[in-house]
């Protein structure tokens, strides 16, 4: 650092000065060099850990800093070649220079289109990269395979080091089939995620039989699977399924599952056995509405049946579309099951289209202690259009409750008022008396002046019980009562 007299004599040139956090001092180039040297003095393990969080192409650029940095990247614990990745020949050269005997994570996105990179990947390229990662006993493997007619190599199905496997075959018209022609042995695998693939009942059974300690399974837009039977996987406790229109599975047998996230589609998925379930997140999608006709009768039946299978769940999350269909079911007088939920999360904007369903769920949850309201869109950004719900109501001679219809009419984030949120909270307090805590996560939904107004309104709400209300807006939380 310069002496104090020199610091105060002239103002340093902006091109060579960076202001530090102190108001009275500045960082000169010599100071920055010293700071840089301090970083370079860190142990290799620390530097490699830092670089492992960067895309590999950026980590390699640190090699020009000094001799000390020249080979640090080549011993990092992970390699990542994603969207802005280099060509296959360049990747091969990088792998040739990689020296770490053990790899924690390998992530690669293949590209079969010449527009993406100068030379599209060949199947041989992809096979060699997978083989390289396996030769370093990789634990977390993520493959984004935007390829046509690519078959997973048989050697991938036999591996004892993999703990997490992520396979995404790209959103193409014709999905790639995951069809192991050999036995599967993933003896250390705990988390398996499959995106955009064809997988039959037989194939998933073969895969599961080779994963004795699998704990988590994710299926996103998977076809061909009819019955997902997890009864022989006692350690598999977390399941996430997102189904598109007319996609599978259609039956779920999962007696050991404790946590379920199911985003259903127009085609039903029967929950045959989910008897151990303690947490569930449920919603439906609206990918295909033909001739402006919403199959609301079918959806109402489906959501009520799903709710019945989750009667014993202690933590329940319901999405916007799910609540819209529950509201229609309530208007038609459909019987709702009694719920044992102690914590309920509502992921929906506040509107007349969900109020009836919310009130009925609250009335049927006598053990509820905590309610979280998180205004957000529907699952997968495919909300059921409200004009289709209006058409359905008109055709069946149904009407919303007049008081709720006017008070909760607006659904747009731009139109929401603090009074509307306060009225909703008041409705909740009037509906259920067992609540101990209400958390309203309003980030991005109501802010600025309206949020301040809401904070002033909430303490004035009438209530018959001692319930705390927490309002959250972006980074700040306010316990107002």
UniProtKB/Swiss-Prot annotation:
PROSITE patterns: FBOX (PS50181). The keyword Hydrolase does not apply. Pfam families: F-box, LRR_At1g61320_AtMIF1. InterPro entries: F-box-like_dom_sf, F-box_AtFBL13-like, F-box_dom, F-box_plant, LRR_At1g61320_AtMIF1, LRR_dom_sf. GO terms for cellular component: cytoplasm. It comes from the Eukaryota. The keyword Repeat applies. Residues 1-28 are annotated as: Disordered. Keywords: Leucine-rich repeat, Repeat. Residues 14-28 have a biased composition (Low complexity). Residues 36-84 form the F-box domain. Transmembrane segments: none annotated. LRR repeats lie at residues 118-145, 196-221, 295-320, 350-375, 413-439. This is F-box/LRR-repeat protein At3g03360.
């Amino acid at each position: 650092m310069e002496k104090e007299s020199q610091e105060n004599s002239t103002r340093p040139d902006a091109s060579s000065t960076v202001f530090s956090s102190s108001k009275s001092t500045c960082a000169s180039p010599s100071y920055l060099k010293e700071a840089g040297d301090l970083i370079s003095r860190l142990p290799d393990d620390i530097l490699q850990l830092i670089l492992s969080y960067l895309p590999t192409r950026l980590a390699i650029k640190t090699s020009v800093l000094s001799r000390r940095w020249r080979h640090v990247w080549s011993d990092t614990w992970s390699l990542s070649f994603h969207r802005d990745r280099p060509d296959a020949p360049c990747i091969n050269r990088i792998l040739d220079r990689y020296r770490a005997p053990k790899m924690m994570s390998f992530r690669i996105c293949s590209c079969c289109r010449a527009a993406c990179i100068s030379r599209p990947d060949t199947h041989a390229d992809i096979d060699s990269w997978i083989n390289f990662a396996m030769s370093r006993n990789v634990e977390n493997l993520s493959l984004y395979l935007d390829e046509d007619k690519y078959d997973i190599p048989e050697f991938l199905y036999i591996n004892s080091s993999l703990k997490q496997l992520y396979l995404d075959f790209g959103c193409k018209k014709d999905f790639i089939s995951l069809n192991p022609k050999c036995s599967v042995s993933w003896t250390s695998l705990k988390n398996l995620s499959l995106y955009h693939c064809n997988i039959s009942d037989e194939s998933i059974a073969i895969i599961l039989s080779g994963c004795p300690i699998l704990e988590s399974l994710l299926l996103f837009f998977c076809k061909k699977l009819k019955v997902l039977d997890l009864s022989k996987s006692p350690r598999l406790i977390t399941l996430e399924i997102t189904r598109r229109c007319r996609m599978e599975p259609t039956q779920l047998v999962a007696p050991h599952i404790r946590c379920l996230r199911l985003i259903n589609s127009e085609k039903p998925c029967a929950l045959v056995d989910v008897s151990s379930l303690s947490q569930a997140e449920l919603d439906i999608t609206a990918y295909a509405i033909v001739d402006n006709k919403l199959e609301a009768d079918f959806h109402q039946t489906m959501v009520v049946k799903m709710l019945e299978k989750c009667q014993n769940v202690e933590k329940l999350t319901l999405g916007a579309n799910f609540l819209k269909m529950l509201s229609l079911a309530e208007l038609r007088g459909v019987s709702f099951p009694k719920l044992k939920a102690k914590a309920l999360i509502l992921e929906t904007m506040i509107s007349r289209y969900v109020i009836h369903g919310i009130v009925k769920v609250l009335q049927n949850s006598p053990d509820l202690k905590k309610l979280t309201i998180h205004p957000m869109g529907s699952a997968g950004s495919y909300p059921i259009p409200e004009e289709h719900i209006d058409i359905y109501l008109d055709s069946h001679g149904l009407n919303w409750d007049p008081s709720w219809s006017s008070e909760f009419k607006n659904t747009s984030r731009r139109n929401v008022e603090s009074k509307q949120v306060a009225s909703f909270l008041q409705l909740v307090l009037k509906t259920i008396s067992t609540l101990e805590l209400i958390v309203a996560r309003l980030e991005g939904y109501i802010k600025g002046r309206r949020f301040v107004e809401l904070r002033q309104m909430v303490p004035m709400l009438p209530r018959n019980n001692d319930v705390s209300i927490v309002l959250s807006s972006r980074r700040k939380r306010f316990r107002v009562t």
